[in-house]
Structure formats: C-alpha cells, structure tokens
Amino acid sequence: MTSTAAEGAGSGSLNPPHSNPSGDGGPRIRSPPGKGNKPVALADITNTGKPNAARSITVPDLVKENTKLLTLLNEKTKIIDLSRVEIYKLRLALQASKQQNLHLTQTNSQMLAEINTGKDRIKMLQHELSCTTALLKVKDSELDRKKNAGNVQQKGVKSQVLKTKASTVAVEAHHVGDSVTSGVEHHVVESQSAVSSNTVCQEPPQDGKQKRMPQRRRSSRLNQGSCEIRGVSQNTLHENPVVPVAPSTLSLEKQYGQTTGKHMKSLQNECSATVHEVIMASEFEKTEINELPQKTDLKEIPEACSSETEVQSHKIGDKAFNSKQNHLTGSQSSLSFNTVDTPEPPEDNTVKRCSKKRSSIEDVNAKLDTITSEPLRHEEKRKSRRKISARLNSVSSEHTDIVVETEHKDVIVSLAGSTSNVSMEQRTNQEQDGDCFSRKSNENQILGRRSLRRAAEKVVSYKEMPLNVKMRRP
C-alpha cells in the first residue's frame, strides 16, 4: 500500500516525459486534441513546443504524502465503524418498532373484537327490551280486559238481580192486589145478586163466530198484572137490555156507608206493608248473592229468573182462575134460579177480606221460602193445576162469562188507580223476561212435558237430471 501510494504521489507531483513520436528516443509529437489516432502530419512535426523540464522526486515528499493518506484512511475507518454502530442501533430500533407494531396490532384487534361484541350485546339488549315492553303491553291489555269483563259481569249480575227483585216484588204485589180485587168482586156480586133478584136475565143467541177465548189465556192476562177482562161487544149489550149493571163504588158507599172506604184504605196500607216486606226479603237475597264468588256462570241466573217468574205467574194465574170460577158459579146460580139473597152486613165482608189478606201474606212468605228450595215441586203443581183449569174451562158457559164481565167493569175501574203502577212494572219485567222464557221453553218440554214427535225429514241433494230423462213424455 505504501509503495503504491508513493508511486502515485511521485507521479502526481512530477510531470511525466513526453513520448517521442518518431521512436528514436526524442520527444514525441502530441496528436492534436480531438483527432483521435490519426497519423501525424508535417504541420504537427514542425510546430512542436519545447519539452518541460523533468522534476526531481525526493523521499520526504513521498513520506508526507504517505502520512496524509494514512490519516485519510484512519478517518475513513472511523467513519465506517461509526456507521456500523449506527446501523446496528437502527436495526435494534427497527426490531423494537416491529415488536411495538405487533403489540399495537394485537391490542387493536382485541379492542375491535370487544367493540363488535359490545355492539352485538347492545343489539341483543335492545331486542330483549323491545320484547319485554311488548309483553308488558300485552299483559296490561289483558289486565284491562279482565277488569272490564269483571265490571261487565258485576253490572250484569246487579242488573239481573234488580230485574229479579222487581219481578218478584211486582208479582207479589199483583198477587196481593188480585186477592183484594177478588174479595171486592165477591162482595159486589153478592150485593148485585141481592139487588137484581127480581130481574129476568135473557140469554143472547149464541153465534158460532163469537166464541169465547180459553180461560187459560185469560189467566195469562191476569198474570201480566192487568185486571182487564175481555169486554162484551156493543151488539150483545144492546140485545140484552134486561141485564143489570153493577153498581159503582160510589153507590156501594152510599148503601153501606163510609166504612168500605176506610176498609179499602186499611187494605191498601196492608198491601204497602207486604210489598215492603217483599222488598226487604229481596234485598236480603241480593246480599247473599253478592257474597257468592264472582266467577259464577251467568247463564244460571236468567234461567233461575225465568223459572221463578214462570212458577209464580202460573201459580197466581191458577189461583185467580179458581177464584174467578168460584165467583162465576156463584153468580150463575144466583141468576139462573132467581133467588133472593139477603145482603150481608159490611162488617162480615171486611172480616172476610182481612182473613183473605192474612192468608195472602202467609202465602207470600211461604213462596219466598219455597221458591229457591223446591222449583220442581212447583212445576208439578203447576202442571196439575193447569189440567184442572183446562177441565173447568170446558164446563163453564159463555153466558155467565159475559154477565160477570159486565159486572166486574165498574169494580175494576175503581181499583185501577191502586194496581196500575204494579201492572205497568210487571208488564215491563215480563217483556224483559220473555226472551228467557222462550229460551227455557225447550228445556221445560224436555223435563216435564211430552217431547215433540217430528217426522224424519228426507234430505235430497240436488243433482242434474240427464237429458234422456228430461226429454221423456209425462
């Protein structure tokens, strides 16, 4: 290295000898610049410059140059070592950065996974929340429906209990009014028979068209609370001018004094007392019904109402019919034989009416005790009484019906004020209970009556007739 450096330094410091172009040891002619390897011409030979003087190369110069080169080499080696250290440091930093990058990527991936799981969990929680809100709404609606249904059931039970109470009160009041009217009618018939003992009763010609309605329908009319009796046509009244007209209540008061009015007032007071007792009994029954559980079948209530109203109405109708038959037979005997009856004093009649009133009150109390316990027994009694009333209907005659109807008109007018309210209430109650009665008619037929025998109906399906059958001659 040193030899080469010295040679380089010597060559760099000294000018090299020019080459001789002629080749005989002399200075050579330089080729003109830019001509390359052209052959030397005469101009070039003749115009040659003077050669430079050769320099002398010394040893100290070479040593100096060598030392300079050594210093440069040392510096370069130092720079190389420093660069190596720096490169190593950079490699270490790169590795550390790579590791940090890996850690960061891992943490980033973990965070992203946690975020995704959190989002999914939020979605699930939102779905659960929506489902729970929907379930709560459904439960609230069900609770509201149950509350409304319970309120409706309570209202229906209350209304039906009120209807049953009103119907029972109206029926009992009508029964009491019927008993009172029957006593008054009996008194009027006796007085009229005594007055009209000397008169002659001419029977009207019986026509086939004017047939009397059955007594059964008449008893049903009395059950409705109306004391109306089928009136006689104007023709029959004009044809029978000899038939006596029943005296009014004013004439009775004139004949027997004002004792009858007092007795009527006492009877009305007793009627109001009995009605009050019936109302108290019905309220007691209402309290017992309210103590029952609210989940009772609502279908049993209208059936019981209809059965009770049927039993009471038929029982009252049968009693009214029996009393009417007794009055009819009494009046018929008095009119047919033209016997003279002495009128009884009003005190005996009032005693009779009081006894009848007491018996009717006892019947009312007995009914209230036996209606709920023995409904089937009442139905059997009603059937037997219906049969008896049907037999009695066949025996009664038309003429006695007409006479008694004309006799009862004035008495009914006098008592219409006291029984009009009861009749109106009972009519409305029976119109409301008509539907229940129509529903229970089939069940009553199955229980007590003979079942209807219907012919088997042949079911024929429609089929198209073939053409050859259509074209046949009849």
From Swiss-Prot:
Residues 1-53, 189-226, 322-356, 422-442 are annotated as: Disordered. GO terms for biological process: cell division; maintenance of meiotic sister chromatid cohesion; meiotic sister chromatid segregation. It comes from the Eukaryota. InterPro entries: SGO_plant, Shugoshin_C. Residues 211-220 have a biased composition (Basic residues). The keyword Lipid metabolism does not apply. Keywords: Cell cycle, Cell division, Centromere, Chromosome, Chromosome partition, Meiosis, Nucleus. Residues 12-22, 190-201, 322-341, 422-431 have a biased composition (Polar residues). One of its GO terms (cellular component) is chromosome, centromeric region. Highly expressed in tissues containing meiocytes. Expressed at much lower level in leaves and pollen-containing flowers. Pfam families: Shugoshin_C (PF07557). It is found in: Nucleus; Chromosome, Centromere. Belongs to the shugoshin family. PANTHER family: SHUGOSHIN 2, SHUGOSHIN-1. Plays a central role in chromosome cohesion during meiosis I by preventing premature dissociation of cohesin complex from centromeres after prophase, when most of cohesin complex dissociates from chromosomes arms. Required for maintenance of centromeric cohesion before prophase II and correct segregation of chromatids during meiosis II. Has apparently no function in mitosis. This is Shugoshin-1.
